[in-house]
A protein has these predicted regions:
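Active-site loop segments of alpha/beta catalytic cores
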Residues: 1-160
Length: 160
């Protein structure tokens, strides 16, 4: 399958999460993890997740909802997992809310990148200030007009 989807430089994209990598790139997940203890996750999921990440060149784990947060430590233990994408469930603040900043810092301290989704334009700079720009991939939500885009580009210039 990879031979069919790779581009001219050997990369591929996973468009649902807007990621691309110069090699085998995919989003990995286990949504039932919300119903597993960390011990069960380590026993039944982690070995298979690790095998997937070994095969891939770049991997991003889809961490889905607050009930799955108990799996952050087991995820940080997967050596070849590159990043963790955090999706708060409906009814919770979006990915740019300060209530998630500690989670993002914890993931970064664990050596993984973070994809923050559902971030509003006005939350971008406070998020970068709180977490730092390294290893942070921000997906801005909603319609962003040209003026807002230009303002964001000027705002993030200091972090380049």
């Amino acid at each position: 399958m990879y031979a069919r989807v790779k581009d001219s430089v050997g990369g591929n994209a996973f468009s649902a999460f807007q990621i691309w990598g110069p090699g085998k790139t995919a989003k990995v997940q286990c949504d039932i993890s919300a119903n597993l203890s960390p011990a069960m996750f380590r026993r039944f999921v982690q070995p298979y997740l690790a095998a997937q990440c070994e095969w891939l060149d770049f991997s991003l784990y889809h961490l889905d909802g607050t009930n799955a947060l108990q799996q952050v430590e087991p995820l940080l233990e997967v050596p070849r997992l590159n990043g963790i994408e955090w999706t708060p469930q409906a009814g919770r603040p979006g990915g740019g809310d300060p209530c998630w900043f500690d989670l993002y810092r914890r993931i970064r301290r664990g050596g993984k990148s973070v994809q923050a989704v559902g971030v509003q334009p006005g939350e971008v700079i406070p998020l970068i200030d709180a977490v730092g720009p390294e290893g942070l991939y921000i997906l801005v939500s909603g319609a962003v007009d040209v003026r807002t885009s230009e303002m964001l580009m000027r705002g993030i210039e200091a972090y380049r």
